[in-house]
């Protein structure tokens, strides 16, 4: 007869590992996020769970895995169970909203977060504001920049214009000029269109030309074409305005989740004035008129455009902005938009109520103000 043995011992299940979800999280100050711990196997035996933050000035965690964002920066949240551990990387942004909730007029910060346009003045002044959102209409973004953002796993949200201009040796830049003063080059060889309907005949087709300029949204694409297809001459400084826009990255680094700074197109400048200054720019209103038979047109009765733009960034710290009309009553900015081998378009506006879309020879020197996609 076999012996029967009775025991009160219960077999323990050995812990084999732990995981955390999510493993990365982006937060705004005062937000909370619950982390979920999973043990393997799920019926493993363990006595205690230890949660810690390596930077409690940025984010704290309680005994249940609830993370609270404190201030801008990064922190690693660690959970330890016996000899096993797992991490969650936390990024806390400086703003009070993220790109998903962007609105025209919001302040774009150096870390890629935003301050709502209604944020109090003191907070805006103390923040590292580098730009202002001028459109959240992704149909007014160039296809190339949307592709560039998606390649970074960033869904396109809109466009930002810089609050300050490049502060290099000069505030003014030519569009293209070689050391021997040659300012003519056919950029259609590398895909840049010429934005003047019927240029060769010198006929004033203002509505057709307006349509070309208004729908010119591929600033990023054509900046990249110059930077890559004309690389040697670009790096040598022949493309003054486009290189100034690229070099602005050194002065004001763009967030990783953006396209980086570039020289805007004429159509993008139209959207800046429409959305930030409240200016209607169409070819059907009574104030639209052709300046001459060479593709130049303008509008009048648009109010104090410079003052309105300055009001948009009134609370940005002085060292982070360049006021409009800082060189006088009128602003003149280069766009990437070529007209012919030796001409490119500029945008001009002033406090006398005029907005101009003109072309100038590429050896003229005008200002540069950059944009980026986010």
Model-derived regions, located:
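Extracellular/lumenal glycan-associated surfaces
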Residues: 39, 259-260, 266-270
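C-terminal, surface-exposed recognition/capping segments
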Residues: 9, 266-374
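Short, compositionally biased
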Residues: 7-9, 93-258, 359-374
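C-terminal motif of bacterial Sec signal peptides marking the signal peptidase cleavage site
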Residues: 2-5
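Extracytoplasmic soluble-region selector
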Residues: 7-96
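Exposed, tryptophan/tyrosine-rich binding patches on extracellular proteins
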Residues: 56-60, 132-136, 334
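A glycine-rich, coil/turn loop motif that links secondary-structure elements
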Residues: 66-68, 257-263
């Amino acid at each position: 007869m076999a012996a029967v043995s009775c025991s009160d011992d219960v077999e323990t299940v050995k812990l084999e590992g732990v995981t955390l979800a999510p493993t990365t999280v982006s937060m705004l100050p005062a937000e909370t996020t619950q982390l979920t711990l999973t043990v393997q196997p799920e019926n493993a035996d363990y006595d205690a769970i230890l949660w810690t933050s390596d930077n409690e000035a940025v984010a704290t965690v309680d005994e249940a895995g609830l993370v609270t964002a404190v201030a801008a920066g990064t922190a690693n949240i660690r959970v330890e169970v016996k000899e096993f551990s797992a991490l969650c990387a936390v990024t806390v942004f400086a703003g009070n909203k993220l790109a998903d909730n962007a609105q025209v007029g919001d302040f774009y910060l150096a870390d890629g977060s935003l301050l709502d346009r209604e944020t109090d003045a003191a907070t805006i002044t103390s923040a590292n504001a580098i730009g202002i959102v001028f459109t959240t209409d992704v149909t007014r973004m160039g296809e190339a920049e949307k592709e560039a953002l998606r390649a970074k796993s960033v869904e396109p949200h809109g466009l930002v214009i810089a609050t300050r201009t490049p502060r290099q040796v000069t505030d003014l830049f030519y569009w293209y000029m070689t050391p021997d003063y040659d300012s003519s080059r056919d950029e259609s060889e590398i895909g840049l269109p010429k934005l003047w309907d019927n240029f060769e005949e010198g006929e004033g087709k203002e509505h057709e030309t307006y349509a070309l300029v208004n729908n010119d949204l591929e600033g990023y694409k054509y900046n990249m074409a110059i930077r890559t297809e004309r690389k040697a001459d670009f790096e040598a400084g022949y493309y003054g305005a486009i290189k100034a826009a690229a070099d602005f990255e050194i002065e004001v680094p763009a967030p990783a989740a953006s396209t980086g700074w570039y020289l805007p197109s004429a159509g993008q400048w139209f959207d800046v004035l429409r959305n930030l200054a409240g200016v209607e720019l169409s070819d059907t209103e009574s104030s639209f008129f052709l300046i001459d038979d060479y593709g130049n047109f303008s509008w009048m009765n648009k109010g104090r455009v410079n003052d309105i733009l300055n009001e948009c960034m009134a609370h940005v710290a002085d060292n982070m902005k360049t006021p409009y009309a800082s060189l006088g009553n009128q602003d003149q900015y280069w766009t990437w938009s070529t007209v012919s081998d030796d001409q490119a378009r500029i945008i001009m506006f002033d406090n006398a109520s005029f907005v101009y879309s003109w072309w100038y020879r590429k050896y003229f020197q005008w200002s540069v103000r950059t944009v980026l996609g986010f």
